[in-house]
Amino acid sequence: MESKDKSLPKKQRTVVAKIANVLSYILVSLLLLIILVFLFLQTPPGQNFIRGKVQTYLQNKLHTKVLIGKMDISFPNSITLKNVYIEDQTKDTLISGGQLKVQLNMLKLLTNEVQIKEINLENITAKIKRVNQDTVFNFQFIVNAFMSNQKDSSSVHDSSTLKMNIDNIVLNNARIIYQDVITGDDMNMFITHMDAPIKKFDPDHLYFDIPTFTLTGLKGYYYQNEPLKPKIDSAIAVAILKPENSLKIRNSEILLKDIDIDYKSVPTNITTYLKLNKLTAHPDTLDVKSLKFAFKDIALDSSDIALEMGPTKKVQKTATQLQVKEVLSSFSISAKDIAITKSHFKLDNSSMPVTHYGMDYGHLDIQNLDLTAGNLLYNLDTTMASIKKASFTEKSGFVLNELNTDFLFTNTGTSLKNLYIKTPGTILRRDL
């Protein structure tokens, strides 16, 4: 019995063969074209072509000036943007300079997953501001531009939930400028290095697990000016009186090195200068919802802390402020172990007169402070700790060789149990 192929006329077989050949040529050509396009996009001219398209798209989308100096795509692992500049709607700088490198699995994007291994920012300046009472932050137009697309698409079809995960965030030589006229905040900070590996990233529920947080070379200032009262009261009430909106953070270790910042609060008339050589802390619980922060241990080494205080005006509190104060009454900080070595503490309270004899407790200058303590608890009406060892020298000439006691300060009184004080000429033991 003859095969079906042999049963076909010769002319018909020739036509089928020609069609098959044409289709094979088309498929091979398409495959080669895809390969050539892919290879082209890996070349500098190809990536410059993409850079131009992305830059034009963002400018048309945001209706503001957007510049991207260079784009480097290493498929399928990373995207790097260099010399980025984005203006806000007032033609002031929003983001500028440096390099943004994102290491991610691009193939996961096809399954609606954003798996980011690391976000690395270098030599970046970000300026965030809200300069008028009835305006929003200067980055809000970006949120609005992209959120509008999500609203339009959701009305057409219900897409699957986007899964997002970030494993690590690194900052190198970054400056953050923050100004908010409503809250009165004015901040300008430079970060030499920050490393924040993330074990759990859940922005929908505001839950973040950051096992180790490292910050090196933080320098700058944070000023708190007089806020716009009605606005700030409302903002605080939303943040504090609605605990379901609270941030949830889990952390095992905090490492701070080479910190030099100035803090000034106009409402409280307090100025603080912090120069921390090294601070290490191991949190046990960071409960933002209940305002309770517990640490296993805190260690401060070779640091300078200066505190300036002045008289404050008594202001009649609003009902909202009183309600917030009641919630804040649960605020507490505790630590099982505290260690301070080779540090300097200075206090200058201008509301207290200067004393020219003995130790002036309103104008202290303590050098070579070494302190070991345990069971520290601080809240709005109680301070307590067990001082195991303490020594320092003070500008008045007073020298403390050794101190240990269990102290308790409350709104109703003070107690010092198992008090032991040793100076060059005195030894004191008693309970107060």
Model-derived segments and spans:
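Flexible beta-edge/linker motif
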Residues: 43, 67-136, 148, 154-226, ...
